[in-house]
Swiss-Prot record:
Gene of this entry: tom7
Protein name: Mitochondrial import receptor subunit tom7
Side Mitochondrial intermembrane, residues: 37-52
UniProt subcellular location: Mitochondrion outer membrane
Cytoplasmic face residues: 1-19
Transmembrane segments: 20-36
Keyword terms, alphabetized: Membrane, Mitochondrion, Mitochondrion outer membrane, Protein transport, Transmembrane, Transmembrane helix, Transport
Record-stated family: Belongs to the Tom7 family.
Gene Ontology MF annotations: ATP hydrolysis activity; structural molecule activity
Amino acid sequence: MQISEESKERLVKVFNIGKTVTHYGWIPLILWLGYTQSNPKPQLMRVINPLA
């Protein structure tokens, strides 16, 4: 099965966007999960600035 050149370009673009989203979204996702799943919930200011 042959994939057209346009389809290849589109797939490359989608993978590049996915790579960028994963790269910049991984740490905020982990922080958000830790914040929302912890018990008791920490104050948001403490999460943003630990010295506050």
